[in-house]
């Protein structure tokens, strides 16, 4: 069977049949609309369904991206603000894809940060994770984004990785190195 109803297509794609019907009617995806009396029947070719299904697998939601990174909402937002990941707009995504981040970008970010670990022996009280780069630890809000960018560009490299932590949540940085960055950024009067 090459042509599928909107219900069958929706089930295979992992979305509601109403979205499939709407996408065909608005020509967002290719399909057939046949009108019989008062009823409008929508059918979608199996190849189109498979293409949409594959496209949907390439993207991850914000929640899934955070889970893969192993970070809180606040840390995730700071990573986004510092340019770690590009949030795709609806126009940049394929038809019927609602997730905003490319899965390969998220995985590449995790790999890049984990590969950047440069082990050094320092006192554990000076260790800081992503969650510690905050106002609570004495870092001004304006400097947080700059520090995150330096971490992303590997100007500040992690000194340790806690075993068993998911994503980048186990990375530990030298807090004195982070504090030194703040001193560099402070304007001199």
Region roles according to the model:
Residues 1-189:
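Intrinsically disordered, low-complexity regulatory/linker segments
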